C-alpha cells in the first residue's frame, strides 16, 4: 500500500513538472516584422513640418532652447526584449548576413545603437540550446542620427535618395561637432580637451571604423594639435575652411579643393568631418556633397536645419546663413541645384570623371 501511494505521488509530481519548467523563449519587442525608428519624437515632428513652419521655428528662441534641453541631437536605441528561457542569453543582430551585435548577458533586454535606416535586421536569442528568431525594419527617414557619447550633432551623411533613385551609402561619411574642444587662445595657451569618452572612442574607431578625421577648424582653434582626438589610427586632415558666402573667396575655394580631394581617395573611408559645432563649416561641406549626389532640395535644407537640435542660438537660421549658401550657387549654370553645384566644383578644377568617382563611391548600386 505504501509503495502504491509513493508511486502515485511521484507520478502526480511528474505531471506538474511542465507547469514549473521555464517557459520557452519568446521575442517580445520589436514584434516580428515591425518597423522601428531611432529618431526622437521631437525630431520626427520637426521633419514632418512644412519648410515655412521649420523656418519659423529656427528663429523661435523658446523652442530652440527647449529642443536642445529636451531632445538634443542624440538618437534613441532599438530596445530588444524577450521572455522565457534561462540565462545567460546569447543575442545576435545581423544585417544582410553581417553581424552588427553579438553579446551574452543575463538580462532579458538589450539596447542596440546606430542601426542604419531603411534596412531589415535579423535577430536571434539563444539559451540552453533553444533559440528564438525574428526580424524588424528601420524606418526610411533621414537623417541617421548617431550615438557617440559626449560628441554632439553626429549624423551619417548617407541614407537619403540621390541620382537615379539610388540611396546614398550609409557608414561611409559622418558629420559631427568637434572631437575635442577648441584650444584656449589667450596666454597661457592650452590645447583642446578630448571630447570622446572611452565608449565613444570605441564606437567611432571600432563600430563605425573611422579612418579619417577632416577637421575644418582654424589654426587657432586647433593650436597644439598633432593628430586626431580619435587616436593614432585615424588620419587627421586639418583644412581650415570657410562657410556660406566664404565659398566665393579664394581662401574658401582653396580649402574646399583640399577637402574634396580627400573624398576622392577611397583609402580615407570611413570619414568624419567636422568643425567646432558641426553647424556652419560642416553644414556647408555637407550641402555640397549631398547636392553632388543628387539629394533633393527639401532634404538638403532638412540636413542643414537639423543642427538646431544641437545649437540653441537663433543666429543659426536661414536668413544670412542658409540663404547666403544658396546665393553662392544661384547664378551659376544649371537647371537645378545639383547642376549648379557641379558648376561650382568644376570651376575649381575638378572634372566629370572626379564627380563620377565620388558618386561611384557614395551611391548604392542600382
Which stretches of residues belong to each language-model region?
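Bacterial N-terminal signal peptides
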Residues: 7-16
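Ser/Thr-glycine-rich phosphate-binding loops at phosphate-binding pockets of nucleotides
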Residues: 277, 281-282
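Cys-dependent protein tyrosine phosphatase-like superfamily
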Residues: 21-272, 284-366
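Positively charged n-region of N-terminal signal peptides that target proteins for export
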Residues: 1-6
